């Protein structure tokens, strides 16, 4: 990172789960220029086709890059990362970092060799994830649970609403009786944001692993190898694709996470 200027990094997700990845990166690299975009008009991505996700993600990243030249993009969404990375890397000359379920570290730390992958419905069914399991967790029994409801619960928490523990427990019910399940992969960036609540529902689980710290280290490594293109002292900004009813409450949320302004992207323009 041979530049007096701070790099501009875009974090992208369909919702606000990417805050968990952004948090780890900002702790490691506090002085970067951070942009965050959540495509709430298209939320959740787990319910969309692969082609829709690819076209939507590419269009939004291009639009932001035209106004705020980017040095690095983090796709802070496991579902999107399983399908969009080749298209983004083909279009952008800058590094694009994806979010991969932490199957390998989970398999390494599990003592019972019985692990669970908690992710979105879209992520658990991808061939990419099956390949990760085959490569890194061949000696493990791997339970897979795909949930849209947990994503919604995490979003509600970020909007300042109480977590519905009854609904959370119901969603995790298939795993509550598996006593030798000792490690859970939080395979959606939303889930670290409700990790304590998930722990309460699964008391037998000893280890919860996610990709946040590994992504932060990857970002640091990549930035050390590139020349910074953006020359800006802009404040940290957050983008959405449609405004919502509790916008006033959400302004408090974005300031808490270190962003100065919420901007609505007009994707029809």
From Swiss-Prot:
GO BP annotations listed: cell wall organization; peptidoglycan biosynthetic process; regulation of cell shape
Pathway(s) served: Cell wall biogenesis; peptidoglycan biosynthesis
Chain residues that bind substrate: 13-14, 45-46, 78-79, 189-190
EC number(s) per entry: 5.1.1.3
Reactions listed under catalytic activity: L-glutamate = D-glutamate
Keywords per UniProt: Cell shape, Cell wall biogenesis/degradation, Isomerase, Peptidoglycan synthesis
Signal peptide: none
EC primary class: isomerase
InterPro entries reported for this sequence: Asp/Glu/hydantoin_racemase, Asp/Glu_race, Asp/Glu_racemase_AS_1, Asp/Glu_racemase_AS_2, Glu_race
Active site: 77, 188
GO terms, molecular function: glutamate racemase activity
Family affiliation: Belongs to the aspartate/glutamate racemases family.
Cited PANTHER family: GLUTAMATE RACEMASE (PTHR21198:SF2)
Descriptive protein name: Glutamate racemase
Species, as recorded: Pasteurella multocida (strain Pm70)
């Amino acid at each position: 990172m041979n530049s007096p200027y701070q790099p501009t990094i875009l974090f992208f997700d369909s919702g606000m789960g990417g805050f968990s990845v952004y948090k780890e990166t900002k702790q490691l690299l506090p002085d970067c220029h951070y942009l965050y975009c959540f495509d709430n008009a298209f939320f959740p991505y787990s319910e969309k086709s692969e082609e829709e996700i690819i076209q939507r993600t590419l269009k939004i990243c291009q639009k932001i890059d035209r106004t705020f030249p980017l040095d690095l993009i983090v796709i802070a969404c496991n579902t999107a990362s399983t399908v969009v990375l080749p298209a983004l890397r083909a279009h952008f000359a800058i590094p694009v970092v994806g979010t991969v379920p932490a199957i390998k570290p989970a398999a390494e730390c599990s003592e019972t060799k019985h692990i669970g992958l908690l992710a979105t419905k879209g992520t658990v069914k991808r061939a990419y994830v099956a390949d990760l399991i085959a490569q890194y967790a061949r000696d493990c029994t791997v339970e897979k649970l795909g949930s849209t409801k947990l994503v919604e619960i995490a979003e509600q928490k970020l909007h300042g609403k109480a977590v519905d523990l009854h609904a959370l427990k119901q969603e995790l019910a298939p795993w509550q009786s598996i006593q030798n399940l000792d490690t859970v992969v939080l395979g959606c960036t939303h889930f670290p944001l409700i990790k304590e609540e998930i722990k309460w529902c699964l008391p037998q689980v000893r280890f919860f692993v996610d990709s946040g710290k590994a992504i932060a280290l990857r970002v640091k490594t990549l930035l050390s190898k590139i020349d910074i293109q953006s020359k800006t002292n802009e404040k940290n900004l957050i983008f959405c694709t449609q405004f919502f009813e509790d916008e006033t409450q959400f302004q408090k949320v974005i300031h808490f996470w270190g962003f100065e302004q919420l901007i609505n992207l007009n994707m029809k323009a």
